[in-house]
């Protein structure tokens, strides 16, 4: 139909008004599609999710919005007196931090509101909350994507619901919830890009990275703390399975570095050093020269193992060591785990031992030091590291005392068999330690890993000895259980507990008559058939007892 465009022409020649005007002829040209478009939700996307959520929240009655009050931290008094104020408080909480401190309760409340609104606030029109589910899900998925990226960057496979993934690192630590909720916002190429992806809008000005960096640091702390606890549990399990021996280590939960002999290859003044911050040892960069800090354990309780079978672990703290650049090759760092260290290392430094070096361009390789000279052996393998990585170096396996293994977070990375017996072994090589090296990088240093825990255990895979006990005086070889499991702390007390003195006295005449020149007090050797066969020579003054 047609209609006059000039209001003065709206009166026809017959004096009557002509009806119809505007884009839709005052409604006379509406179609079904046009009307549906007025009430249909647009597709929910990452860009419009929060806006649509706000739009639909504005449709809810005040009573429904007040149900959010207890789930929003630090809401302003009076904010929930009006619909507009309540919605603004809810949206501010979402945009300031995409996870409420009580996110689980928030999700539960919304699900009840969406699925059974009458249970929450009584009967209300379903049309008021249509579309809220899609908007909420998109916001939820956006957050979950970011959380998954963060977990994967830390080497953790995301599983379960969003809140499960955030709290997946620990069910035991109550403070993890706050740290994980805060840290979940922290991964994107830049803070500006992240802010835009999360809120669906470009920030008016550049956002500071300080806040997300701090919260990511909290999550890194949580990860390393969990790994430290896992390493300690593994140490206790190893100790239990190996029927005793030495089991110890250091969690560095103090502000001083005691129980260690510390040596710096380039001095500790002006060239970097390790500092205890109360939870870990952290490298402090100074100058631009390479420097290596070597730690040898001196705590009497665990400075040496009882056997040649050793297992040492090291847990990376919240600071991940710098990787060397490929071109030009500069900077970087390394961390070494040391076993079978010479007994006089606290006096002269490490002259002998076996190590694994982790660092450089994300590599790891086993090596040994003999008379002060380092030799790398086996193959170099790819090896990354990060906050909470657990590395272990095992000296001696079920296949022999000359076998070595390196593992990361459980799986074995590298092995070496010292078939030529080129590394040192024996009672004078049972100390252990670790080291961190900062390499020079232009005007600075490549910061090495911080260390939050180290552990040591006897790792005899047989769970039995095989050494010899000289019951006449000193201990020639030491069983995994101190003094042969007698409960004694000296050889003399062990003889008394075993009744050896009486036994020797009773059998002395027989011994003299059987073998001329046999000492009055013989030696007793106990071991397996295989260990007995492996003995190159047999001493006529030793009594050999084979257990199997």
UniProtKB/Swiss-Prot annotation:
Q: A single Pfam family, by name?
A: Phage_tail_C
Q: Which InterPro entries match?
A: DUF7257, Minor_tail_gp31_C
Q: Which domain of life is it from?
A: Viruses
Name of the protein in question: Gene 31 protein
